Amino acid sequence: MTFEELEDSRELYNDKITEVKNLRERAELYSQYKKAYKAYFVNYQLQATFTDIKYNHKLGIDAFTLSCTGLIDTGDTYYSNDLINAKYKTVNFTQADVEIIKQSEGKFTEEYDPVAINQRSDTVFKGRFLIFEFSKKIFGRVAILPVGTSSFFTNPVVKAGLKPIETESTHFNRIFKIYAEDGFEAFYILDPAFIESAEHFADRYCYKVALYFIHDKMFIGINDGDDSFEPPDPALPIDENKERAKVIEDMKPITDIISVLDLL
């Protein structure tokens, strides 16, 4: 894929979109543009940064992978795409964009129609999940959630039997709620170096980071509302330098986690 071919794809979209009325055909036109964008920008930058890469922009982390932890609710509607399986230096990882939607009962009004479905959709998570191999294998489960996390995320942890604990770090306890099946196992992970690194990482991502430890895996959710690796409006010419910088920025959480949390 060359930049000229990407621009051809964008121009083809603009030439045909006004003629196409069928929604499915319109979506297919945009899909072709998106595919070209990700082949040129995203795949190139992944190849330049990581090794052992398997990237599929249509696939994601399946809901079962998260729900089988017993700690993460995947809601009523679950979307995931931009699946990356790769290695950064010596660390294997998986990451994908994830959106989780929960249906909740709305309030009845005087105009309530009993035939209509009276529900409200709430996006409870929009961001990314990352899965890493973790060097410290544990036999229990540990969840570290941002203070103020909604009951949607705390309820599964409590139902799984994890108990709240605190560290000796006042600041860490102020920004995170820690739940563990076994306190001894939790403190095996939460040594002073890790606590300091996690505080730094959470600060970098505005305290919207949740960490889950299950055996030799670490799951990290960043609920920042971002949808990474998405193309710009096809109606406008593509600024190549701007888009390349944006893709590099979208990749940054992966390298940040590995570097800041000292997973190497």
Predicted regions and their residues:
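Charged, low-complexity intrinsically disordered regions
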Residues: Y40-L264
